[in-house]
Swiss-Prot record:
Bias-annotated ranges (Basic and acidic residues): 178-197
Protein name per the record: Chromatin structure-remodeling complex subunit rsc1
Function field: Component of the chromatin structure remodeling complex (RSC), which is involved in transcription regulation and nucleosome positioning. Controls particularly membrane and organelle development genes.
Entry annotated with the keyword Membrane: no
The organism of origin for this protein: Schizosaccharomyces pombe (strain 972 / ATCC 24843)
Gene name in the database record: rsc1
PROSITE patterns: BAH, BROMODOMAIN_1, BROMODOMAIN_2
The BAH domain, residue ranges: 351-469
Length: 803
């Protein structure tokens, strides 16, 4: 890959897998502990002369390492091909020598690692080329069959954690393979930079039919299933094997099928019923079972996923088509209205509305807040009524956000909610600008048309906000490249943010329950009022995300600063003996089980959002061979359920620890950890709140653990030693005083305004110490002078005495 081309996300993931594989090859050793990789890494001759067809291929592991560093591999099969040809040349070089057996052993190790990577889901199904065959040295480079090439060569996904990777089935629809071949690959087989930019994942701006929405829900649930160890079972079924490297598969299977083929057929609307979609899934699993040995892991996974698919279908069969847009799909158009006559424009109040125009749709829930929308399609129904398919843009008060969130004035958020409205529901025009243009000017000729600013998307499923990176990707295809004239400001304006418009919904103790309200079937599923969530703490991220399945309490709702409780005063509390733990725990339980303020949760928005964000129906749990798990209903007393907030106050209590030999039921692949298949998820099935041992016991607040015989020095009022209690402050009733904070007024220093001096004792000590030092120094000097004088006398006497 050219250094000027920025590697894609798939190329980076592939590079990590290749590095991991290459490290295992370099670490391979023989029985004596000697590394085997130098045999193929330090070839002493040009191995390209041995195999003429290997011109341009790496001749050492170092050259393969260089190709990995430069992102020249777009598919794992290319790496396998180069590594296989490297072994062909090295074996030809050492043929007839003792080294040949070591090279062959290293090749077998690579084949074994290839199978391990496939079983772990890192790579698709790839076979090692037959390097012993003479035709192996003359075969062409590996490439996919155009009939099944639904993705470019670098489109392979190496799914170790499918949740981290994106779900391509919920985004851009796939193009024809021949179109991709022309647009994505040049003559040299490398990708152009502009094509790589176009491959960047962007949400689809096309509304989905009810069949597509239902199919994608089923596809996602089956695809994301994981066993107890976290392994993704669906990884081998993502793509078809390479026909050049695995021709026997296509000889044995008459109708090859994989997820890539199903996705292509679904995006091209080849399925007329959901049964046809399910038949292809069953065909894919049946092919895997017929081709693989019954004892293989792929066979067991295919059999399990087929049964799991049947249970998912039973769970989804009872749902209406209108339910699927709420939590699994990004868009929806009304399927019950046939769109027979597609029109380029429609006239309303003497003006023409075209695709891409911004309009305000009547909002039956709040007529003062019409729905900001953009037209994606104009059509006429069978009863000769003009309709428009629009994409909704929600206002801040129509979203679920934290109480400390701030927004721009006139800000709206793009959603993936698509609706069909009669033209008669359009109440006027509007205009939405991206923030980079909004601060620079206004569109020309809009007059009094309201203008809104947009910077982020809003996910109605996860209640998350995310910044928009490409405004053109948010536009309909008909107007994605068009521009409009602007009247620029003298200088860019500075936008200010305002507080949440829902702060007035914060409940008070005197506020009663609001009366329920009904809305129109085609109105805002999130109408005039949004919902407030707890403000983010310092340790939390800046995201507005929240899980609707997390229960909220009155302690979690944000409180304005003016009404926040005052800090505790420095008042003593008495260390009195409490009656029993049950009274304290019941009081705490009553406090923690307070109901959520009804103004935030009983509004129409919360009734709808609670339904739409409820957890997906529980996936059935299966006990697979080799990974059986005991479904024990016993819960450890110290286990915390993931649905409870970590900020809850847990009352003190005595603990009786009991050993449990059973394991908890559930699987990582099972959403709710159901005890039996088809068990629905319910809040009541959650374990009770845990009780922890206290880090320390405040004296006087607990009973003695042993009531049989009092311990000497311990009275019935406190649990501290009486000798220690005598040293503590007490009131007139001889009750020990316990302060909540340290004292504010320490003992003042004497002579605060005077100069600080040493004490008399210290001064006398320094004087005596100094005089002692002086005396010792004088004595040392006197001895030194005497020694010098004696030396001088001795030298003079020696000089005067004749020899």
């Amino acid at each position: 890959m050219s250094s000027k081309i920025r590697p894609s996300a798939d190329d980076k993931k592939l590079q990590r897998v290749l590095y991991f594989f290459l490290e295992r090859v370099r670490a391979a050793k023989d029985v004596s502990g000697q590394l085997l990789s130098p045999l193929i890494d330090n070839a002493s001759v040009d191995t390209a002369s041995v195999s003429p067809s290997s011109n341009g291929r790496p001749t050492t592991l170092k050259s393969i390492q260089s190709k990995i560093d430069e992102f020249q591999y777009h598919d794992f099969s290319e790496f396998v091909s180069d590594l296989a040809y490297l072994f062909i040349n090295v074996k030809a070089l050492y043929e007839g020598t003792q080294t040949y057996s070591f090279v062959q052993a290293l090749e077998e190790f690579c084949i074994q690692q290839l199978r391990t990577f496939q079983q772990q889901g890192y790579i698709p199904v790839i076979t090692w080329p037959n390097t012993d065959s003479p035709s192996a040295t003359t075969s062409s480079p590996i490439s996919r069959n155009p009939e099944y090439s639904v993705s470019p060569p670098n489109g392979s996904k190496f799914v170790k954690n499918e949740d981290e990777a994106y779900d391509s089935d919920l985004y851009v629809e796939e193009e024809d393979s021949d179109v991709k071949g022309r647009s994505m690959v040049g003559r040299d087989g490398r990708y152009k930079s502009e094509d790589l930019k176009r491959r960047k994942l962007q949400p689809s701006s096309k509304p989905l039919s009810s069949l597509e929405a239902r199919a994608k829900v089923i596809m996602r649930q089956v695809r994301r299933y994981r066993d107890g160890s976290g392994r993704q079972l669906f990884a081998p079924f993502e793509r078809l094997p390479d026909p050049r490297m695995f021709p026997e598969y296509y000889q044995a299977i008459e109708q090859p099928m994989a997820l890539e083929v199903i996705q292509k057929k679904l995006s091209k609307h080849r399925y007329e019923t959901i049964e046809q979609f399910v038949d292809d899934f069953n065909l894919m699993f049946d092919n895997a079972k017929s081709f693989n040995d019954p004892s293989s892991q792929v066979y067991r996974d295919a059999d399990f996923l087929k049964n799991y698919l049947a249970d998912v279908l039973r769970l989804e069969a009872g749902k209406l088509d209108s339910e699927f847009f709420n939590y699994e799909t990004d868009s929806r158009a009304s399927p019950q209205l046939p769109k027979n006559d597609i029109q380029p424009a429609v006239s309303i109040d003497g003006t023409l509305l075209n695709v891409g125009d911004w309009v305000l749709i009547r909002n039956p829930a709040d007529s003062s807040k019409p729905i900001v929308s953009q037209i994606y399609r104009i059509w006429k129904s069978d009863d000769d009524i003009n309709y428009v398919t629009v994409c909704w843009y929600l206002r801040p008060e129509q979203t679920v956000h934290r109480a400390d969130a701030v927004f721009y004035e006139n800000e709206v958020f793009k959603t993936s909610l698509y609706r069909d409205h009669p033209v008669s529901e359009i109440v006027g025009r509007c205009f939405v600008m991206y923030i980079t243009r909004y601060i620079r000017g206004r569109p020309k000729g809009i007059r009094s048309t309201p203008v809104f600013v947009c910077e982020s998307r809003y996910n109605d499923d996860t209640k998350q906000f995310s910044k928009i990176k490409s405004w053109k990707a948010c536009m309909p295809q008909e107007v994605s490249g068009s521009e409009y004239e602007m009247i620029l400001f003298d200088r860019p304006i500075t936008l200010t943010k305002v507080a949440s418009p829902l702060l007035h919904l914060l409940a008070s103790k005197s506020q009663g329950l609001p009366s329920p309200a009904t809305t129109d079937s085609n109105t805002h599923m999130l109408p005039s009022q949004g919902s407030l969530l707890p403000p983010s703490s310092i340790s939390e991220t800046k995201s507005f995300s929240t899980k609707a399945s997390t229960p909220l309490s009155t302690d979690d709702i944000a409180t304005p600063l003016s009404s926040a409780p005052n800090p505790p005063s420095v008042m003593p509390t008495y260390a009195r003996k409490t009656s029993s733990h049950s009274e304290r725990s019941s009081h705490s339980s009553y406090h923690n089980s307070s109901h959520v303020p009804t103004a935030a949760f009983n509004s129409p928005i919360m009734r709808t959002s609670t339904k739409s964000t409820s957890p997906i129906p529980a996936r059935p749990f299966y006990a697979q061979s080799g990974s059986l798990q005991s479904l024990n209903t016993t819960q450890h007393s110290h286990q915390i359920s993931g649905g409870h907030s970590g900020r809850m106050n847990v009352p003190y209590a005595k603990l009786s620890y009991t050993s449990h030999n059973g394991r908890h039921g559930g699987s990582n692949g099972n959403i709710s950890g159901a005890k039996t298949p088809m068990t629905n998820y319910t809040i009541n099935s959650m374990p009770s709140l845990p009780v922890f041992p206290p880090a320390f016991i405040v004296p006087g607040t607990h009973q003695k653990l042993d009531e049989s015989s009092p311990v000497p020095g311990i009275d019935d009022v406190t649990v501290i030693n009486t000798e220690t209690a005598k040293m503590l402050d007490k009131d007139e009733h001889q009750n020990v005083l316990w302060y909540t904070v340290p004292p504010l007024d320490p003992i003042p220093l004497e002579n605060r305004n005077g100069s600080l001096t040493h004490s008399v004792e210290y001064v006398l000590y320094k004087k005596s110490k100094g005089s002692q030092v002086i005396t010792e120094k004088a004595r040392s000097n006197e001895l030194s002078r005497e020694a010098k004088f004696e030396n001088l006398v001795a030298s003079l006497s020696d000089a005067l005495i004749p020899p």
